[in-house]
Amino acid sequence: MVGSEVLEECGEKISKKESKKRAAKLEKLLRKQEREEATSSSLSLEEEDESCSSNYGDVTTNELQSAVEGKELTDVSNLVEEIVGSEVSIRGRLHKNRLVGTKLFVILRESGFTVQCVVEETRVGANMIKFVKQLSRESVVELIGVVSHPKKPLTGTTQQVEIHVRKMYCLSRSLPNLPLVVEDAARSESDIEKSGKDGKQAARVLQDTRLNNRVLDIRTPANQAIFRIQCQVQIAFREYLQSKGFLEIHTPKLIAGSSEGGSAVFRLDYKGQPACLAQSPQLHKQMAICGDMRRVFEVGPVFRAEDSFTHRHLCEFVGLDVEMEIRMHYSEIMDLVGELFPFIFTKIEERCPKELESVRKQYPFQSLKFLPQTLRLTFAEGIQMLKEAGEEVDPLGDLNTESERKLGQLVLEKYKTEFYMLHRYPSAVRPFYTMPYENDSNYSNSFDVFIRGEEIMSGAQRIHDPELLEKRARECGIDVKTISTYIDAFRYGAPPHGGFGVGLERVVMLLCALNNIRKTSLFPRDSQRLTP
């Protein structure tokens, strides 16, 4: 056809105009199909998110009040390679999270142990990612997922497996703005110093901030470990003493007058009568021995109205107290101490390796050096060592903090031990009920025990003669009437006896070489702190 271009398609001749018309129609049809597919895909995603909506969310109070049949939670500490492939349910705090592409990496923390959890959008939907992403740090969550091998070794968690999350629920939301971040509170001093050198100064959480917000502070791995170690010290203490025939007792903490006749007591009104909080179970321990209990111990609170605001003084602490009948000589008490504490130290090493490692990560320290046979020096020998080192000390006075530290260094250098005993102390620096040394009344049948150059306990043989006891009480300025029931206990016959007392917090502080006793007191009470 002249003036007209003819095309052939499938044997049919069509004009160019008709071809364009058909192409436009086809393109319109394709666009319609794309729109339908997009709509279908969108509906599919909505349906998917709708179907996944039961896999995440906040748990209601009613749900928390109801029992869940067959529910079993796995501790984060038990998430190990041996259970890779298993589906587990775990609970913990949201330590932190990080979004990388379509994957949300969540670090979950439980009692100082951490695990990486992976939430993938392709598996759980965008809405679940959004839900998890907006949860604030320290919120309590539960999740269900499969234990898997990570693609690369993990360095930011305690567990070397990861959880591929299927479901996650929030049991309790934390406030978004925290007074301290647990991650900051868990940072070691060396890491803080290193960050400064690298030009990225990390936050340092100060002691008062920690103690004012103790409920957050004790969530750090090191603090979790410290109080687990403390628990094991008590267990080992009880275990050893019970194996030696000791009976655990509980003495009153409300008493008339003053505990040991000292001024450092918390006085109070007791129904119109003057009273105080016991600064020692000493008197009642002795009365128990007079009641033929022979060997007793107590784990309980002790109150001291200390004015000292130092790294090692508290106004309330846990006392580990022992009293025992003496069969032959007061050295029997020292023999007991010399066996008891190495037993405790050994048990802690055996039972708390993970906890000790957690403490070391934040507060590096070397294991305590002690001898199989506990070193025992006289007070005079200790004074002589200090004098030979050029220290000026009173031969009949008590050792101050600096003298204790110096003597600890000298003992470590000479005897290769950080745990030792110093006995036969001057009578002038001992309580009124301490038995004088038979060969020289300037000294007494008493001793102190030291760890890493600091005194942790005092012990002695007690005076069991009522006349001598009255005499010593008057010499110390004590009103005998206020302790008459105590003295009367010895008028009915009393066996020779003695004992010792030690602060649990101080033992743990020195065992872990910590620089402040407040780190080993759950909610410390000192001369300036009564809360939280």
UniProtKB/Swiss-Prot annotation:
Chain positions recorded as ATP binding sites: 304-306, 312-314, 455, 503-506
Cell compartment(s), UniProt: Cytoplasm, Cytosol
UniProt-annotated stretches for the region Aspartate: 282-285
DNA-binding region in chain numbering: 88-169
Annotated spans, Disordered: 31-58
Alphabetical UniProt keywords: Aminoacyl-tRNA synthetase, ATP-binding, Coiled coil, Cytoplasm, DNA-binding, Ligase, Magnesium, Metal-binding, Nucleotide-binding, Protein biosynthesis
Coiled coil: 7-41
Alphabetized Gene3D superfamilies for the sequence: Bira Bifunctional Protein, Domain 2 (3.30.930.10), Nucleic acid-binding proteins (2.40.50.140)
Residues that coordinate or bind L-aspartate: 260, 304, 458, 462
EC number annotated for this UniProt entry: 6.1.1.12
GO CC list: cytosol; plasmodesma
Keyword Glycoprotein: no
GO biological process: aspartyl-tRNA aminoacylation
Job description of the protein: Catalyzes the specific attachment of an amino acid to its cognate tRNA in a 2 step reaction: the amino acid (AA) is first activated by ATP to form AA-AMP and then transferred to the acceptor end of the tRNA.
Family from the record: Belongs to the class-II aminoacyl-tRNA synthetase family. Type 2 subfamily.
Name of the protein described by the UniProt record: Aspartate--tRNA ligase 1, cytoplasmic
